[in-house]
Every structure is written in structure tokens, then in C-alpha cells.
From Swiss-Prot:
Family, per entry: Belongs to the heat shock protein 70 family.
Lineage of the species this protein comes from: Bacteria, Pseudomonadati, Pseudomonadota, Gammaproteobacteria, Pasteurellales
Modified residues (Phosphothreonine): 199
UniProt-listed CDD domains: ASKHA_NBD_HSP70_DnaK-like (cd10234)
Membrane-traversing stretches: none
Induction conditions: By stress conditions e.g. heat shock.
Its biological purpose: Acts as a chaperone.
Cross-referenced InterPro entries: ATPase_NBD, Chaperone_DnaK, Heat_shock_70_CS, HSP70_C_sf, HSP70_peptide-bd_sf, Hsp_70_fam
Protein name: Chaperone protein DnaK
Region called Disordered, residue ranges: 598-633
Molecular function via GO: ATP binding; ATP-dependent protein folding chaperone; unfolded protein binding
Polar residues bias: start-end ranges: 598-616
Amino acid sequence: MGKIVGIDLGTTNSCVAVMEGEKPRVIENAEGDRTTPSIIAYTNDNETLVGQPAKRQAVTNPKNTLFAIKRLIGRRFEDEEVKRDIDIMPFAITKADNGDAWVEVKGEKLAPPQISAEVLKKMKKAAEDYLGEPVTEAVITVPAYFNDAQRQATKDAGRIAGLDVKRIINEPTAAALAYGLDKGTGNKTIAVYDLGGGTFDLSIIEIDEVGGEKTFEVLATNGDTHLGGEDFDNRIINYLVDEFKKEQGIDLRNDPLAMQRLKEAAEKAKIELSSAQQTDVNLPYITADATGPKHLNIKLTRAKLESLVEDLVAKSLEPVRIALKDAGKSPSEIDDVILVGGQTRMPLVQQEVEKFFGKAPRKDVNPDEAVAIGAAVQGGVLAGDVKDVLLLDVTPLSLGIETMGGVMTTLIEKNTTIPTKKSQVFSTAEDNQSAVTIHVLQGERKQASANKSLGQFNLEGINPVPRGMPQIEVTFDIDADGIIHVSAKDKGTGKEQQITIKSSSGLSDEEIQQMVRDAEANAESDRKFEELVQARNQADHLIHSTRKQLDEAGDKVPAADRGTIESALSDLEKAAKGEDKAVIEAKIKALAEVAQKLAQTAQPHGDPQQAQSNSKPNDDVVDAEFEEVKDNK
């Protein structure tokens, strides 16, 4: 059985880790980095770039470079949060046929799970390169406050990437696993404050140790799935745009290229202001008008940044209060505060968290890697490699059904430990009613319409008797991934109807299978592209070395031989610009053969074997170049 890897599929960055014996290890990607930007770009050459290569070309290709896709996963186009993003994202967010929020790139509509799968594929490839074996199973993390549709969509992304998702685990819980694995013994209650690129979670977790076995029990969780570093960046961007408009009278919001440059500059300024008191945002040639080019140069102080985002930090503390109340704990009863997510590096965030809890947060947990490490630990538990660890997570939102008068009747309360199962008996609202519709809801409001609709199904064939007589037993079953299964049974007739919740949105199995097939087809075309690039690199190397030898040999080369070599060089240069690998390889062979004479002419006193080898494509050099090209895919 292969390894089960742990993947933190983040809004801004993603990370993959695996257990090596009893120790988790973060795996570097092809570029040698421990985290990978969750950015996907579609180039004019029909190439898909993921991670740093995609980020590098974002400024010149803003409409086809997709980032923060996690904010759209499992969401409806009509959601308020999506409407806010439509105004600020340089790429097109569009409405899918099923009402979901999708993205349009080059006239093609793409589902968020399909896009996220590209990031997961890169994580999978990094793990395979490191382990030297295929990776087919993973534990993937999600924000604790993700609803059922968002969890389903994340699992779909895993399937499209060719991964069997063994478990969906909540990010703060994963961070607690990473923290608790090597932070000594004893019982502790910890708060995990997880402010990432696009989401915020707060979980109160109890770590108990009995007889060497550690139990991680989530007491309560709360959060905001649309609050994160991207929102902090947007505050800076809006400030810079407004300042520039005041100075120059030009609104940069209508210029996607300028907005992409501003996004990069805002992120850079935010990071710099975590250690410096002031930074210059300097973007020459940001735009132009009839009077000529315009340059943006604005000073930004830490104090100004803090004034721009202080309400966002304050907003994050409200879920903290609710989670503490739900857990029955006061801030003073929390033993340790763990900060997770890159945005927690901001001094203001650290100060406010310290002020709230009355204690300094721990600094010995890497905020970028803890979640992936925890996912790897859970992978080790599922594989049987990690013993004596028990994880008890909770469902973040209450679950119930709509009953008479448009009321939500709750069957499973929020913060119930999962997996769990709960049944309740309902009856009909009308005389002689032969069917009932079970409308499944998730949320905390009493008014059914104010909660998230997860879907509905019918139970038919009920005996036509006076209202209130039939006994319909509705059962909710939540699995360890937090995914919901619902059944309804008429106790009178024994008829039963059951479904795994597929929200009215989401991808159908057929759509997922099609996306899996597309991904496999792309993998084949990617392989052919890489082979073509390898052949071109061999050609470039041979052309360069042959020209160099031809120049050095000068008049020593007979005119007839020079003509033959020049002709072979020209043929290879022409072939290398084409798309046919076989033709390029044939021309490489032809040039290598005629270049042997040149090598002998250029080095008449040298080792003939050495001279001959110099004229051939140098496999080592080519492989290095080939790897570099592959990395950028």
C-alpha cells in the first residue's frame, strides 16, 4: 500500500507533507519551495502553468491567471460573497447552468473543483517525485467552517486530480495535530486561530493524554469562509487606487494589467510592513493618458495599513467569542494559542489575539506548514503508521429539515462530534397526503429560507390518512469527512428513500468523470509537449556547440564540408521551430554525423573519442534544461 499524503489546499498557497516513520515531512515542489502558490494560468500556447511559474506571468496575462479559487468552491453565483469578488477579480466569474459560480477562461467555462485539481496534481507530482512511487491517496484539508457543498466540491477536486480522498479534515484540527504530536505530554485546551488567504477559522480543541494515547477532541468551531489575506490585500489595493485617482484623475480599476501589478505590490507591501514601519509602493509606467506615461509612487506606513484593516481583525474576533461560548470556556482557560495561516504574521493580528486571550500566541508552529503536517499525521493514522492518536472532530453548522410554516427544525446541533447519526419522527401537514418533500438545511437560523439549502428529495407512497397520523422517520448520518447522508422512512408502509446530499449545485458524477478524462488526456499531451521540449533543447545545444566549433576552426574546414554543415545546421534550426519531435531528432542525428568531421578538424591533436563526444548532444546538459522546462508546467 502506498503512502497517504496530507495536502493543505489553500486559498493563496498549498503544501504537501508525508509521514516518514514517526515524523512528518513537508515535501518541496519542483521549484524547490515548501509551499506552492495556488495560482493557475492558461497561456496562449495552450499550456497550463501552476504555482510560481503561473504567478510570474500574472501581470502580462491577468484575465487567464486564476487565483483564490477556493473562495468560489462550492458556492452559488448569487451568493453575496461571490458578488463582492466579481467586482475585484481580474478574471471573469460566470454563472454555470446549475447556478454555481464558475470561471470563464478563453471562452470556456471551468468549475472551481476542476481548477483546484490542477494545484492538487502539482502537489501529487511533487510527492511522487520525492517518494519515487505513485501517490493515489490523500487527506485534504478544508476550513472548519466549510459547509457540505464546499466539502463535496473539495472531494470532487481530489477525484479530478486522480486522488482517492481518504478523509477531509478541518484545517485548525490539522494544525492541532501538528502542534500536539511533539509538544510534550499532559492535558491541554488550545485555541487554533487560523487566518489564511481567504478563510478564517477558530477552533477550541482539548488534547488529552491517557496511557500514551493522545485524544484530540474539538469542543467548538466557528469562522468566516470569506475573510482572509485576500481581503487585507484588497484594502491596500483600494487605498492605492483611490490615492492615484486623487493625484492623477485616472481610475485604475478599469485596467486589468494595472490591477494585477497593484495586487502584487499590495501583497509585497503588506509582507514588508510586518517587519518595517514604512514602505514605498513604486510602480513606474502604471498607465498612460494623452499627456504621457504615469507612475505610481505612494508611501505606506504600518500605522496606515493597520487603520485600513483594523475592522477586519476585529471581525475575526467575533467567531472567537462564539466558539469560546459554545465550548463553555473563558479566554483564561485556554492553555495555548496557535496561529495558523500567513496573515497571522501581521503584528496587529498577533497583538489583538494576545490582548483577547491575555497570553502571547505560540511562535514555534510554522503557520504555513502546520496544516499540511497535520493532514499527513491523519494520513499516517488512517494507514496504520501512526498509533495512539485519536481525532474527534465536529460538524461546524447545525443540520435539520424545513417543517410547517417555513421553520428549520434542527436534528443535529452544531459542534456535535462526528461521525454521528440522529433520527426524529415527523408527520404530514395535510389530510390524505401521499408524499412528503424532505428539504435538508444547514445553518443556525430558525427561518428555513435564511439557511443554506443542501438539497431535497421526495418520499412517496404514504397511506392517504388524516394529517398527523403517518410516522415519517428522518435520519441524518454525518460521516468522518463531515459529508451528510439523509434517509426518510414511512414507518407505516416501510417505504424508504435515502440520499447522500448532493446540493442543488455541485458537479454530477458524469461531469467529474469527464473532467478526470480531460485531465488524463492533458497528461498525455503534457508528456508529448515535454518530449518535444527535450528534443528542442538537444537541438539548441548541438546548434550552439557546432557553430562554436565552426567559428573556432575557421579556414581549417574545407569549403565543401562547411557547406554540408551549414546546410545541416539550417535544417535543424528550421525543424526545431516546428512541432514534430521525430523530424527534430532526425535532423539532430544528421547534424551530429556531419559535425564529427568538424570536431576532428577543430581538435586534430586531441582524443578523437573526446572530440566525437563533444559534437553530440550532451545528455546531462539537456536533461537539466528539460527538467527546468518541466518544472514550469
